[in-house]
Each structure stands twice: as structure tokens, then as C-alpha cells.
Amino acid sequence: MPRQFPLNKTRNIGIMAHIDAGKTTTTERILFYTGRVHKIGEVHDGAATMDWMVQEQERGITITSAATTCQWRGHRINIIDTPGHVDFTVEVERSLRVLDGAVAVFCSVGGVEPQSETVWRQADKYGVPRIAYINKMDRIGADFFRGVSMIRERLGANPVPIQIPIGAEDQFKGIVDLITMKAIIYVDDLGKTSDVTEIPEDLADIAAEYREKLLEAVAESDEELMMKYLEGEELTEEEIRNGIRKSTLAVKMIPVLCGSSFKNKGVQPLLDAVVEFLPAPVDIPAVKGVNPDSGEEDVREVSDEEPFSTLAFKIMADPYVGKLAFFRVYSGKLSSGSYVYNSTKGKKERIGRILQMHANHREEIAEVYTGDIAAAVGLKDTTTGDTLCDEKHPIILESMQFPEPVIHVAIEPKTKADQDKMAIALQRLSEEDPTFRMSTDHETGQTIISGMGELHLEIIVDRMMREFKVEANVGRPQVAYKETIRSKAKAEGKFVRQSGGRGQYGHAVIEIEPLEPGAGYEFVNKIVGGVIPREYIPAIDNGIREAAETGVLAGYPTVDFRVTLVFGSYHDVDSSEMAFKIAGSMAFKEGAAKANPVILEPVMKVEVTVPEEYMGDVIGDINSRRGRIEGMESRGSTQVVRGYVPLSEMFGYATDLRSRTQGRGQYVMMYSHNEEVPRNIAEGIIAKRKG
């Protein structure tokens, strides 16, 4: 089957936003207008097509980013709906990795909220061109222009409106298109019919002012246009559109549109903007990777003729077909039933069927081409972030980095029958989600699950019960503390057993030193002259890694340190890998204890929104939780307090805030960084762990 849409008529976009800005509703409307869905699904009825997990329909939030495909004005648009809740930022990170452009949805009342900042920074990191859509223009308190200035101030972006609203709140009737300088007035409720008329008189001045700002921004994209603009010549509609596209692709400007997705206003112009201003796969640089054989950089041009390469960006357990791997094709083409090479794992895999996903139903296709996003059935060893490619032309595309979990709970199966099922369920769920980890507590033997927040773990447990029918008891959430060292030290580990039979002998001398936060663990081998045979070096490294899992102070994992192996000795007969592993472990324990060890705790960035009269109370409470206030600002009649608070002090904060503010306060928090725990609190943690 030949390619349906040429590459320049393909758009891979994400829809990203803060929770509740109306992202899923916007996607639903897009699917409705592009003819993919015959009846509009409403999020608050639990019937939205994109939110297809039961948990999502109950909670009215989007958890997994469903990929779906639709068509508009002769273009294929692949949409990835990303979750806006902070516990699921890993999904957003994954999606941005495989997108070419994005639509950032903002609420016209809330403006730029904390999660919008996080998502925006993630998009900046990957250099994703964006257009902004200020939604919910029909809500009380809607203010388009405040939204635009917040994008400028809080996100440091360059927002340029290409539309302005006609009316606001319940008077929101349509939009003024600043490119054509015409008004679009919506006539019916479904928003399918609209009248194009002259701009209402009361808006003529403001439309002219914003048109001028648009022309100025467009002129900056091109010298010729700049000359024309400065000489006072009119720019043609085509020149304006080309200028907007050029600046958007270079991430120099963010075109801003407005509408009310729920009331079906403004969605078709948004689709037009996606097609006109966001990049096709050919507009972005060729993808870079590393040749696993030579270790040298390799490039794949965006073309069906190039060797096949693709990145698996999401794995999902599907009740009907088993494991589904979502992937983005960067070069070449792929037929179902063919073999591919997983260069990340070094294994060959067979692609069973290839499915094109529409939010919750699927269509089987024979072939996928460069720029497509699809899902494959039958990949056994592939996990998130793996590269699949042509075996004759191997390449590893850059993978993704995921944050460490900050919270964990103990979980126990209710019955013996649940025990085996639970292990399988947790294994499957951790394959899908790299920020969810499972481990066993060495002392108690309990299974520990870790994740990005309370909601994240609640949903995991919920899915385990629904999808895998596992009943489990869940403990109280615990903070994922870490340990690190603050100074250098030298230490040795000597393990000698020479009593009857075969002896054991391992001896290692190490230097241990702190690294900057987030650097992880580094092992440097400086053994010279064969004082320790080469084959025993990895055993010492493994011994240190294992010992670092349970730190010297309170048994928490030790992070951010470098060990240099400087000396040691061995015995011709008695030395073994086991002996050197134990020697490495002993050396680490002695070294870490000498190197001024400390406990680290996760610190959260917190933003609390409260009516003014509760402000003093809320600030006092944050201070009493060892918090640091960073700043305050007023939004309408409410005040926003921003600060940093240790996660251990935030358990149960939701209930507390509700009772302090009579249910009128709201807060969001996200992981920021790790900080050293004050000594008096560290002593309490150590005493509790040692029981």
C-alpha cells in the first residue's frame, strides 16, 4: 500500500497543558471536526474517546497519552494527548521526544499554572515549536490578554496573538482573525456554522493594535519583509502566513489563538493553525544517533529511502493483544511481519501486526512510513526508549532520561493466590512506566513500590486490582530518602578466610569522594601493574553498588559519589569474584562512614492558591512545615504563594489546607530537588530505622 499522505502533509503534534485547562475536550473536538468521532464525548460525563482507561473516566483526568490519527484539509495529523497532572510528567517527557510540534492549551481564567511551566520547560528542552490556545473563553473571569502576558512573563516566551476574542464569559461569540482582518461569529451550538463578517466597531482599535504587533513580529523573521514593513508597504496574507510559520518553526514566536472547546468555538481555526504553522517531519533536523558497532555519531535523514529507524516511546499492556509498543518512525519504512533489530538491547525482534490507533479502537495496517506514529504487537523485549532499526544499518537514537521516584509504599498481597499474580502485575506495570519501580525491603522482605507521587501510586494499585485482579493491602506512603557523602576518604576492604578447604581472599583499597547532585555513581579503576587481576575489577564495582543500595547511616541508597580503586592484592589460589565483591562492599562501608555521610530528602516546589483572608494562616503553616516562601502574587481575588517544602512535611496537606481555608484553597506540588536533612531530624530518621 503506497503512502497516503506525503511527508510534508504529516503533522505529529502533542496537546499539552495544566490539569483541567481543557486539553482532552479540545482533542475530542478536533476528532469530531475531522470526522473521526460522530458524537462528541464529554470529559465530565466520563465518555471522552481519548480517556479510555476506567480510572481516567472516573477521575476525569488523562493518565496515559493515547495516540490517535485524524485528517484535516488534506493533511494527516497524529495527535498525542498528554496528561497534565504532575505525577505523570514522564508521559509528557516521552511524548515530547517523538513529536514535531505542540499545542499548549491554557485556561483563560487560571492562565499559566505550575504544571504549564513544567511542561513548557520540557518542550524547551527538546526545542519543540508550539502554538498556544487560550481555552475556556466562556468561563467567568476569562481574560485573553492576561493569559498572553502571563505566557510572556512566566514562561519567558514570545507570544503573538493571531486572533483576539469577540466578547468574553457568556458573551463570547467568536474571534477576530488578525491575518485576514475578518470576524468569525459562531451561529450554532456545534460550532460547525460560522459567519465571516467585518470586525465589530468596538473592537476595531484593539484589532488594529494587535495586527500591528503581529506584522512587526512577522517582519523580524525575514530581512525582505522587514524592509517592506519599514517602508510602510502592505504585507500580503501569504507573506504573513509564511513569516508566522518561519518564526514558529525557529521557536522565536508562539502564535496565540483563543476559543471555547466545550462550546465548540475556535477549534477549526486551531486545526488550520496546526496545519499552517507547525512543522512537518521534513522541517525538523535529521535525527542523530550512535552506531553501536563503531560508537560514532550517525545520522538518519527524514526519508522513506533511508534505512529503517524508530523509537519506542510507550509500552502498554492491552487486554486483547498483549503488549503494545507505540513507536515513531524517523526514517525508512516497515511492513508487518518483518524482523527488526533492537539496537538498545542487541536483540532481533519480529513485528507481528502494526496498528494505527484511534483513541480506543484500532485499525490494522500493512506498512508504516517515515514520520508515522503507530503501535506494534509482538515485541517481547522492547521497553520504553529503545531504538528499533534495520539490522544491516544499526543505530541507537538518543534515549530519554527519567526522574527518580520520590515516594514509596509497602504493598502485600491479601492471599497466597494473589502473591504470584501481584509479582507479574507489578512487573508488567513497571515495563510500561519507567518512573514506577518495585523492589524488596532487605530487612522486612516486603515488596516496596515507588513512584512520582501519591496519585501515581494510587492509580498503579487501582490498575493492579482492575486489570490483573490482584487484591492487596497498601501501607502508608513513605518518603524515598537518599544518603550521600560530603567529604573525601580512603578506605580498604580485606576479606580473608583460610580455615580448611578452599580459602577466600580479596583486598581492595579505594578513595571515595562526593559528586554534584544528580551525578549518580562513578567507578574509576586506577589499578596498575596487575596488583588486582583485571577479571576481579567488575566484582569490586558490583560489591560497591550493592553496598550503596543500603547506606551506612539509615540504610537508604547512597547517591552522587565517585569511587576510585587505587590499590589491593590477591592470592593465586584463594582469590575469587565473590571474595573481591565482599572486599568492595567492606571498603565502601568503611569509606562512606568516614566521608561525613548525610541523609537527603526530596524537596517539593509547592504553589498554594487561597483567598486573601487565609493568606497569613497558610504562610505560617508552610513555615511550620520547614518550608521556604519564594514569592507571592495576586490573581484576581485570590493570592498565590510559591515556595519549597520537604515532601515528608506534605503528607495529608490536602485535608489540612481544606480545613484551614474552608475548602477554598488549592495547591499543586512537584518534585524539585534533594536537600540535606537537618541534623535533629536526621537523628530521628536514623533512630526510627534502627528501631
Curated annotation (Swiss-Prot):
PROSITE patterns: G_TR_1 (PS00301), G_TR_2 (PS51722)
One GO BP: ribosome disassembly
UniProt KW Protein biosynthesis keyword: yes
Ranges for domain tr-type G: 8-282
Binding locations of GTP: 17-24, 81-85, 135-138
Xref: SUPFAM superfamilies: EF-G C-terminal domain-like (SSF54980), P-loop containing nucleoside triphosphate hydrolases (SSF52540), Ribosomal protein S5 domain 2-like (SSF54211), Translation proteins (SSF50447)
Protein name as it appears in the record: Elongation factor G
Species of provenance: Heliobacterium modesticaldum (strain ATCC 51547 / Ice1)
Name of the encoding gene: fusA
